[in-house]
Amino acid sequence: MPKYNFMSQTNTIILRFPEGKAAEFERLFKAEVLPLWRRFKSEGKFLAASLTPIQGGMTPRKGLRHYILHVEVPGMAEHEAFDSHPLFTKFLAKAQAMQAEDPLVWFGETLFQV
């Protein structure tokens, strides 16, 4: 039985930062994005969200730290509401300046879920 009565949207982004910038990225994320995630979750605009340092499955180039950013939203409207939120766009400018490479981004309508 589906967890929700509708098809959600799953978003996955691979972020890549120089090791020397990873702690600063994590600090900024915790201070600036995590409170916004919690707000969106409490308002029903996020179903789930996580930021996970990659520890297996592939070996990043020496000196880089990779993260999996995973967000599940009810649909594209909530996705766009978050992406255009002023607090997020302010954070995004800082995070993009720290990234070693452009992120890898995927999203789509969730097919199966438990």
Where are these regions (language model features)?
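Residue-level signal for well-ordered alpha-helical positions
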Residues: 28, 82-85, 94
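Extended aliphatic helical segments
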Residues: 14, 33, 71-73, 105, ...
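Short amphipathic alpha-helical segments
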Residues: 21-51, 90-92
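Glycine-rich beta-strand-turn "strand-cap" elements at beta-sheet edges
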Residues: 2-6, 45-65, 90-114
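Glycine/serine-rich loop-strand microenvironments at binding/catalytic pocket rims
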Residues: 2-21, 27, 111
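Short, well-ordered beta-strand segments in beta-rich or mixed alpha/beta enzyme
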Residues: 9-18, 48-86
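Intrinsic disorder/low-complexity signal
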Residues: 31, 71, 77, 82, ...
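Glycine-rich loops and low-complexity Gly/Arg-rich segments
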Residues: 36-41, 72-77, 93-98
